[in-house]
Amino acid sequence: MSPVRRWGSPCLFPLQLFSLCWVLSVAQSKTVRYSTFEEDAPGTVIGTLAEDLHMKVSGDTSFRLMKQFNSSLLRVREGDGQLTVGDAGLDRERLCGQAPQCVLAFDVVSFSQEQFRLVHVEVEVRDVNDHAPRFPRAQIPVEVSEGAAVGTRIPLEVPVDEDVGANGLQTVRLAEPHSPFRVELQTRADGAQCADLVLLQELDRESQAAYSLELVAQDGGRPPRSATAALSVRVLDANDHSPAFPQGAVAEVELAEDAPVGSLLLDLDAADPDEGPNGDVVFAFGARTPPEARRLFRLDPRSGRLTLAGPVDYERQDTYELDVRAQDRGPGPRAATCKVIVRIRDVNDNAPDIAITPLAAPGAPATSPFAAAAAAAALGGADASSPAGAGTPEAGATSLVPEGAARESLVALVSTSDRDSGANGQVRCALYGHEHFRLQPAYAGSYLVVTAASLDRERIAEYNLTLVAEDRGAPPLRTVRPYTVRVGDENDNAPLFTRPVYEVSVRENNPPGAYLATVAARDRDLGRNGQVTYRLLEAEVGRAGGAVSTYVSVDPATGAIYALRSFDYETLRQLDVRIQASDGGSPQLSSSALVQVRVLDQNDHAPVLVHPAPANGSLEVAVPGRTAKDTVVARVQARDADEGANGELAFELQQQEPREAFAIGRRTGEILLTGDLSQEPPGRVFRALLVISDGGRPPLTTTATVSFVVTAGGGRGPAAPASAGSPERSRPPGSRLGVSGSVLQWDTPLIVIIVLAGSCTLLLAAIIAIATTCNRRKKEVRKGGALREERPGAAGGGASAPGSPEEAARGAGPRPNMFDVLTFPGTGKAPFGSPAADAPPPAVAAAEVPGSEGGSATGESACHFEGQQRLRGAHAEPYGASPGFGKEPAPPVAVWKGHSFNTISGREAEKFSGKDSGKGDSDFNDSDSDISGDALKKDLINHMQSGLWACTAECKILGHSDRCWSPSCSGPNAHPSPHPPAQMSTFCKSTSLPRDPLRRDNYYQAQLPKTVGLQSVYEKVLHRDYDRTVTLLSPPRPGRLPDLQEIGVPLYQSPPGRYLSPKKGANENV
């Protein structure tokens, strides 16, 4: 079909041509009109835009509907803009109803590289004669009075024909040519058709009371279509005068659209010359008056006054036609009708409307809001998204434009309209808010919103614009519409890490799965473009070439880094991991950061003895017997895989047996001879425990047993090879090697300091000795003197006394053994009853006291138990029973515990406690500590004892006495020894009675009753009548407790009548 171009009158042609050229130069837009018939087959070509617009079509040219349109009605081919009928076809009656003209209007955009063009297309759908007229009813009854005048019109029901124009209803006639009636078909001012039965001659009911006629309705199609209906006319005999309107059959009224409700339009004063009820006229709207008119206008039934009942709107309807019927009330009332035409006068009461249609994206679904708005605009209806329908602007609109859009890109189509007429309906539009967008005229009442600059969503994500439309009325009305343009995100930003390098520290031996750190990257884009995921970049780690993914892992969502294995500082000290952050855009952008994982050392390696190599945890060093003191006899080398303080090694010799004769450099590992081995026989073995520890917290240690074997000869024994930088080789003349292995330089300031320190030490020791002696003498004077007993059979010099260990070893014969307590040599104190002159020479005492060297006491002693075969004092270890041990000799203190006596060693008689009792200083029965000595029971007793302490032959006659329950303390020793035999007080350890050997507890305290025999001992305790010799106990290595037969106890003479005779077998039952 060729396009229909209507250029108007010749006088307006130059003006239209000028306007067309101006529009083409600015917007490159044009209006094209086509026409087609309804019921055309789907696919029928209506026209081609490219040909009709004389456009050169290239490969990049495309035509697209500006708004989403119902493709079932019309289709636009994208390549050349060819318009065709859709699959559903075009039905004019369904699209436009009874409208005289049916036009489909829409906009098409032509895109190319050079420019884009907006084409306004109007397609007129022409009617075809596809519908025949039809009567509402097949039988139509009509009544007419016999007194009706010629020309009386009787309304008939109009046939309906859905076609319009020439194809619509054209004629309605009677089939009988000779009848007193004629049917006339008229068209009203509003376009509606009406049919009247016109009386051609007077009627006489008496001659013919009814007429049966046939109505024929015919349209103007080719060929024409027709329909018939039966018409029954009944002639009534009644009132012969009808009411008459003074205005005639037609009355016209003009009404302003802003007239208030209740305004009078017309006074219909109809008169009837008849009298009585035949002349009483009643007014009413005729049957053809539409319901809308009945709602807007009110007719008084008695007076005939026509008033305004509701507001009218010129833009909605500008003309109303009312049928008013006046009827009398006589029998067979007569009626007259009057047609009232109400014309509405326009005023400027409507503000302009603004409709914003964003550019629809290709392939947008038809259910989207943009598609619904476009379809509604194309069909000429109201905006589907507007709740108030047509004429109500939306509160705001939103468009979406990508941030990568070029300048002059189309954003939206703005359409303005005003329902007023004339100058009141002329609208102008403007855009405010930002210079990045501007408004460009498109065609009449329409504008294009285009970009005026490049956009960046990261800088401005949303533009708030304002559209203002104003008409030219007096006064003008204005509409302000907010408009939002949101910038769509594109993937133009790569993720960025907060730091290029992350430093992380982790201790070695971490558990697998341990958390290390979290890296964070930010992407300024939105949605998937800003969704950051993390991953490891593969690389080889260390010399082994393992993949970094076997060491650590990263959470793709959070960036948290976890260890997959336990790290070892000795094999891997730093792990460089490169993390890549990628977004979810297309194309994908990424960046990376370096994570340096530093492994911190832990003390997880114990020292390893390297040289000499141990055999089963033992070392053997041969030392010549004539080796000089401070000579390096061996060098110990060890290594530790840890570093720093964890790898710093310290050497120490512990548990040297039988005495301390060697020392080791704490840092160098050089073992020096510190004792004299010249008197040791070859083969003598000195054992020590070598402890090598590192500087960790806690430290790790390695131990080995070192055996020093004394060999014959004067040279040095084999030692570890000294390194070139060892202290022995690098010692300058005049210096000596210390125990720690460091070289000491004997310079003058050092000598002065040593001399001064030694002098001060000697002076302090002398002051302490004098004060101690004076204090002791004051106490002895205060007590009235010490009890001293002569030792019978004491021999001078160093001769062995009868009963001594040496004599027992030579086989001097059987004798009772004794319990001797060694004292510190040189203290000046002797046992009970023995003068100080009776003390053995220092050489003899030194030979018996362990740890003494060269006849000088070491300051330590031990509890020495003398047995039948040999003395075991050589293996006893020193132990002080009081906190002041080693400072001052302390006397033993005896305390009655309620069931047994216990002895302790204290510095003073009133200071035998080492802890607070919780009582006050003046409390009755105050005791500062538990002095029972129970902690030493199991250390002092190594094996079970059988029998009592001091049973004699007298016990068989007189029974057991108190002496049987306690050892001898005050009696003289009949068998002197070469040592100072300190008498044993009865206030010693709690006596123990034998128990079942299978029991776990091998002793219990014996209950000692207060007898006359023990009363003397108890009084001695109260008067502090005891020896001040220090008694030292040795818990680690106690000798065995003497048996009953081995204890020499003097006979105790019990007073007669003191005890009853024991029963037979009492001795065995104890």
Curated annotation (Swiss-Prot):
Extracellular side stretches: 30-749
Residues of the Cadherin domain: 30-135, 136-245, 247-354, 393-497, 498-609, 615-723
Keywords: Calcium, Cell adhesion, Cell membrane, Cell projection, Glycoprotein, Membrane, Phosphoprotein, Postsynaptic cell membrane, Repeat, Signal, Synapse, Transmembrane, Transmembrane helix
GO MF, any single term: calcium ion binding
Compartment(s): Cell membrane; Cell projection, Dendrite; Presynaptic cell membrane; Postsynaptic cell membrane
SUPFAM superfamilies xref list: Cadherin-like
UniProt entry tagged with the keyword Chaperone: no
Signal peptide positions (record): 1-29
GO terms under biological process: cell adhesion; cell-cell signaling; chemical synaptic transmission; homophilic cell adhesion via plasma membrane adhesion molecules; modulation of chemical synaptic transmission; morphogenesis of embryonic epithelium; regulation of synaptic membrane adhesion; somitogenesis
Lineage top rank: taxon: Eukaryota
GO cellular component, one term: glutamatergic synapse
Topological domain spans for side Cytoplasmic: 771-1070
Primary location class: membrane
InterPro entries: Cadherin-like_dom, Cadherin-like_sf, Cadherin_CS, Cadherin_N, Protocadherin/Cadherin-CA
Spans traversing the lipid bilayer: 750-770
Subunit structure: The N-terminal extracellular domain forms homophilic interactions; these interactions activate p38 MAPK via TAOK2 and trigger endocytosis. Interacts with CDH2; this interaction may lead to CDH2 cointernalization. Interacts with CDH11. Interacts with TAOK2.
Function: Calcium-dependent cell-adhesion protein. May play a role in activity-induced synaptic reorganization underlying long term memory. Could be involved in CDH2 internalization through TAOK2/p38 MAPK pathway. In hippocampal neurons, may play a role in the down-regulation of dendritic spines, maybe through its action on CDH2 endocytosis.
Full protein name: Protocadherin-8
Species for this entry: Homo sapiens (Human)
Upper taxonomic lineage: Eukaryota, Metazoa, Chordata, Craniata, Vertebrata
